């Protein structure tokens, strides 16, 4: 029988302060994803800290399925899900974590720099990526505004919902999707940045996380939500009156995952399960694109006409410094001009 699971949510600055008060010195790092997971489960507990959107995939699907395997027998989970940047900062401050899953690599780099995650986390299986998605445009049923691309967000009189990029990793993906799509149309970097500014200027609210942004949209805020494809699929599966559009030019979203230094064997076993065919099929069932290309159903997950990656802009370390640094980033300057908080 599966042990009781403790679910905790740590969000915002208060979460970091609370985490710092803990006397638990959590070491964090990345064990080899190719290590054997044979034999019977050793029990124990896995502390999962993740970004907001895959919470129910973990609690309702991945963890129960893992518990049914020989390696997962007797393993219990303590879970914390929230805005990716907030979660990463909380772990750095002392929140217990043996497996971390963030929405963008910059949040993992923070823990590498803190000595909590091994530097070679991205040299593991599937380059340390748990699952894929793409940035999409979620609209009201029937798409009354005729939204087809990121250009429409720039040119049409619509209200946009996207999270705050200084707490949410998904917001950073959204912004780079807009920026990259403009470059791919032949616009200059300044014109692409102007497009980002125009879209952000149409946001009446910037929630703290991708999941909070979806909630705001389904509760009636805004005309268009920029979101992960899996969030749109989730909303439809739950009966929400929405449609979604995959823009012809959009970004491939890749979310990093790693076990922490000195994490228990159960954490590595769970990560191995996440990367297994069984685990990847669970991601697919929940609207995420498997990282194993052999498991991608192209009818459910069509390939966008023009799909680009964050590497095109130099990777997340460069992007975070150029665009999202709180003091000198290009997007920080835009948000400050709009009166939006850039405090991490």
Predicted region positions:
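A bilobed periplasmic-binding-protein/Venus flytrap-type ligand-binding module shared by bacterial periplasmic
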Residues: 135-143, 252-267, 282-286, 291
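Extracellular/periplasmic juxtamembrane helices and adjacent flexible linkers that interface
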Residues: 2-6, 12-15, 264-344
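Short beta-strand->loop
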Residues: 120-130, 150-151, 236-251, 259
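C-terminal motif of bacterial Sec signal peptides marking the signal peptidase cleavage site
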Residues: 24-29
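N-terminal segment of the mature folded domain
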Residues: 38-167, 306-309
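Bacterial signal peptide processing site
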Residues: 31-34
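Ligand-binding cleft/hinge of the Venus flytrap
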Residues: 64-71, 154-208
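Ligand-binding pocket segment of bilobal, Venus flytrap-like solute-binding proteins
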Residues: 185-250, 256
